[in-house]
A protein has these predicted regions:
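Membrane-interfacial terminal anchoring regions of lipid-handling membrane enzymes
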Residues: 1-106, 113-118, 123-128, 140-146, ...
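Post-Walker A helix-loop "phosphate-sensing" segment adjacent to the P-loop in P-loop NTPases
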Residues: 131
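Conserved nucleotide-cofactor-binding alpha/beta core module
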Residues: 135, 139-163, 167-171
Length: 367
């Protein structure tokens, strides 16, 4: 298959025919094998991990031998996700799914708090309620290793080339991405994308109009005006609320350092550490609210962004810790809730504490 035949080859997820070869490449990827062994045998010597590596490769080859379709991969992911949700949450509640047609494809625009869990939770809710799972937009900043790219493309992720900066190349990349999103929707495949680049570390969930302009690149090519084209995408805002953010302290430290020093130097493996912490960390109760399909005319990206934000803020579920952080009085704010917030603050320098409080308070302030 060549780029001429498949204009999306570089960025799209793998299809069924490509699964086996991708899994073979993963098994033969020494960095991937090393990462698993480092996680599983962190306290063992490198000599021991080197000894175990061939056995792990053999085990994975046997275990993955029958995985030959995207659906088979998704069922494996579902199994691990269910185990994770049992041990790291106090339950996940979904609302709004009954409004969606199971035979339609939607563009889900979601607030972004956690790199891996946000799209995983949206997918899980759709799957449990009889809908097809989504194709997930993921930035290439998270794909610095070949094995990371393989893993993401195996699980229905497509690549957003955020690292491209040259204007001409950027226009080409935006055109390809915009076209791919429309092509996916037209062929019955829903899309998940964050409302802006990066997580809302300060708890402020606002849509970047630039994302909406990117969607319309393909519309402009087809000479369709902004309002009409946006309606054709069947945009559905999604609001995810975590009672406890496992990465809240790390986010507050980052915001504090940026405010104090003017910049923040991210560690080499910091994104991976955030992904792991977001998956294995305690999340408390979780609420995933699907909004209404946007059917009204919005003439500008800014006006449409306001409507997406209105739905996300309206459907955001406020937990007791949000109300406490915002200084509200409420019977749900127990001594345990106060103790939980205090415990978090004690882990931060005094100057950084305001950023953690704000991250929980801002969803209240935006209502």
């Amino acid at each position: 298959m060549t780029d001429n035949i498949d204009p999306y080859l570089e960025i799209r997820p793998y299809n069924d025919e490509e699964i086996s070869a991708a899994l073979d490449r993963l098994v033969q990827d020494d960095e991937f094998i090393s990462a698993i062994l480092q996680h599983r045998y962190a306290n063992s010597s490198s000599w021991f991990r080197g000894l175990v590596a061939p056995f792990l490769k053999f085990y994975l080859k046997r275990k993955w031998n029958k995985l030959d379709s995207v659906e088979a991969i998704q069922l494996v992911v579902k199994k691990y996700l269910e185990q994770t949700l049992k041990t790291t949450t106090d339950g996940v509640n979904y609302t709004g799914l009954e409004k969606l047609d199971k035979d339609s494809a939607y563009l889900f625009i979601c607030n972004h708090r956690d790199i891996a869990m946000d799209p995983a939770l949206v997918n899980y809710g759709l799957f449990k309620h009889g809908h097809k799972t989504v194709r997930i937009a993921i930035g290439d900043n998270l794909l610095k290793k070949p094995c990371a790219t393989e893993l993401m493309k195996l699980n229905k992720s497509f690549i957003v080339k955020r690292s491209v900066k040259a204007p001409r190349e950027m226009m080409k990349v935006l055109g390809q991405l915009s076209s791919y999103i429309k092509h996916s929707l037209d062929t019955g495949n829903s899309i998940w994308i964050a409302q802006k680049e990066g997580r809302a570390k300060d708890g402020n969930d606002f849509t970047d109009p630039a994302i909406l302009k990117m969607f319309h690149v393909e519309g402009r090519k087809q000479k369709i005006d902004f309002a009409e084209y946006m309606k054709s995408l069947k945009i559905v805002p999604v609001s995810i609320s975590y009672e406890n953010d496992p990465c809240d302290i790390a986010k507050a430290r980052e915001l504090y350092e940026k405010a104090t020093n003017g910049r923040y130097e991210k560690g080499e493996f910091e994104d991976i550490e955030s992904i792991i912490q977001g998956i294995v960390g305690y999340k408390g109760r979780v609420q995933v609210a699907f909004g209404d399909v946007i059917v009204d005319d919005f003439a500008t990206p800014e006006a449409l962004a306001e409507e997406i934000d209105r739905q996300i803020h309206e459907h955001y579920h406020l937990f007791p810790i949000n109300k406490l952080a915002a200084g509200l009085e409420d019977d749900s704010i127990t001594d345990a809730v106060r103790a939980s917030l205090t415990e978090k603050l004690l882990q931060l320098p005094e100057g950084a504490q305001q950023y953690l409080v704000a991250s929980y308070a801002n969803p209240c302030n935006n209502k």
